[in-house]
Amino acid sequence: MKIAEFLGTNYPVENVNVVLPDALKSQLPPLPNFVFLPSTDSGSFTGEGIAETMDEADFNLLIGDISKNSITIKELGSAVKIAGKRTLLTRDAVDIIAEGNPERILMNENLILFASIPQLQKLLHAAYYPRMITLSQSLMQIAETLHKFTLSYPTSIITFNNGQVLIANAGKVVAVPLEKTNYSALTFWSGELAAKIVAMNLYNPNNFISSSVASLF
């Protein structure tokens, strides 16, 4: 909800809806931008209505704090796989892919991953990708893997390592020194940058890399 408020307050996005399990309905005020979907007895999403809700949006942001409930993970993975609108996953939402059917999910051209190097390492392994990516690799090695990976899959990637922000799309990789941006190694992962990337790509939907680089400043 904090990220939705940040997005709605700082950028002229017409509607910012927050999708929540209906188990929380009695605990929250009846605000018009809350969308409640059916939940399990434990308070997690059942999966009902997720895909339909995502297709009603111009852009989807899965900000994280995802329940570890197996039903939730399975249904979110299925919804992301068929998402017809651009969908950015960040923080622990990225792990949905590695735990689902990564090779098929990664074929969705609307998918954007704002992921750490360890998350990408896990994902490439789960997808049986023939190259590795690790924290100990050089910037050039990581960039080369992202170059090849985004040629193999139509997925876009934003990550950070060795003081550099890396943005990859369709085989093109751009590196931006973090020290030249408005973010630190901590605030990079707060969710606000992910939200800003969503906003900038709504304004300029035809150039993912340029829009995402602009979000850093």
Enumerate the predicted regions with their spans.
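Small-residue (G/A/S/T)-rich helix-start motifs and N-terminal tracts that mark the onset
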Residues: M1-R86, D95-E109, I117, L124-F217
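Active-site segments of SGNH/GDSL-like serine hydrolases
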Residues: F114
